Amino acid sequence: MDSNKITFFTRFEQDILAGRKTITIRDKSESSFQPNQILAVYTNETDRFFANIKVLSVTPIHFEALSEAHAQQENMTLPELRQVIKEIYPQEDCFWVIAFELVD
């Protein structure tokens, strides 16, 4: 994958564009993003570009340490967040929280 590209499931597009989703939680394979890096955002399903984001921080976290604050930044409840993470990464327990903001 292009090092300046990130994908999201289409269901998250509107939350990202509206500023309701300001973090993403990824596994080690996507932990190399750097603060201030500009990423082109595409849909996972169709590879359609829809935004640019700037990485604000990349912070390691264990699954059990996910909190209501993380869920709020994902625009979900904590049980929803934990369920989504386990659906996407069923074998993982260590993740990276990538905080971001939309850029023009």
From Swiss-Prot:
User: What chemistry does it catalyse, as a reaction equation?
Assistant: N(4)-acetylcytidine + H2O = cytidine + acetate + H(+); N(4)-acetyl-2'-deoxycytidine + H2O = 2'-deoxycytidine + acetate + H(+); N(4)-acetylcytosine + H2O = cytosine + acetate + H(+)
Q: What is its EC number?
A: 3.5.1.135
Residue ranges of the ASCH domain? 7-104
Any one Gene Ontology MF annotation carried by this entry is: N4-acetylcytidine amidohydrolase activity
Can the keyword Hydrolase be found in this entry's annotation?
A: yes
Instruction: Please verify whether the record's keywords include Hydrolase.
Output: yes
* EC category name: hydrolase
What the entry lists under InterPro entries is as follows: AC4CH (IPR008314), ASCH_domain (IPR007374), PUA-like_sf (IPR015947)
A Gene Ontology cellular component where this protein is annotated is: cytosol
Keywords, A to Z?
Answer: Hydrolase
Give the Pfam families listed for this entry: ASCH
Q: Which residues form the active site?
A: 21, 24, 74
Q: Which domain of life is it from?
A: Bacteria
Describe its function.
Catalyzes the hydrolysis of N(4)-acetylcytidine (ac4C).
Q: What family does the database annotate? A: Belongs to the N(4)-acetylcytidine amidohydrolase family.
**Which NCBIfam families does this entry report, sorted A to Z?**
PRK04980.1
Full protein name? N(4)-acetylcytidine amidohydrolase
| Originating organism | Pasteurella multocida (strain Pm70)
